[in-house]
Amino acid sequence: MKRLGLVILLFAVISCERLGENPVNGSVYLRLDLLNRDKELRGIPSYKTYLYSRPGVDYNPQQGERIGLGGLLVVHTPLAEYRAFDLACPNEQIPNRNTIVEVDANMLNAVCPRCGTKYQILDGSGIALESKKYGLRSYRISVSGNSGIVSN
């Protein structure tokens, strides 16, 4: 009987698919200024995206700041928590800054325009809503008063 239990346990362990590590791995260090540059994040709920620059269109990082592989999405959830995610879709064959998720109109989800994967962001989880391998890559965020830091 013990052997049968051991065989079943071994089979279960071998048959489970290993997800491996999230393929999105960008370097992140971003200072938040909730009084000026990032004041739109003070509202609940709210979000802001930080994209690699196209002159006059997107965010231009300050000296020493890094915004991940595809850019950053910072969310202020209804529970007054801040969360940060990489915008690169982790379920693309080769995640990069050319295929980034976009926040939908009601701010519930972020959606990849290429593969169609939806990620839950309003609750701060970043999980994939369909049966995809990976959720959005999350980063540490620390907010104190009117400033904060996003890092990995």
Model-derived features: positions:
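N-terminal pre-ligand scaffold of iron-sulfur
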Residues: 19-103, 120, 137-152
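Positively charged n-region of N-terminal signal peptides that target proteins for export
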Residues: 1-4
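Residue-level signal for mature regions of secreted extracellular proteins and peptides
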Residues: 9, 82, 105-108
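Short, flexible helix/strand-to-coil boundary loops that buttress conserved ligand/catalytic motifs
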Residues: 123
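Short helix-onset patch at the extreme N-terminus, typifying the N->h transition
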Residues: 6-8, 22-23
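C-terminal motif of bacterial Sec signal peptides marking the signal peptidase cleavage site
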Residues: 12-15
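Short cysteine/histidine-rich metal-coordination sites, predominantly Zn2+-binding motifs
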Residues: 103-115, 126-139
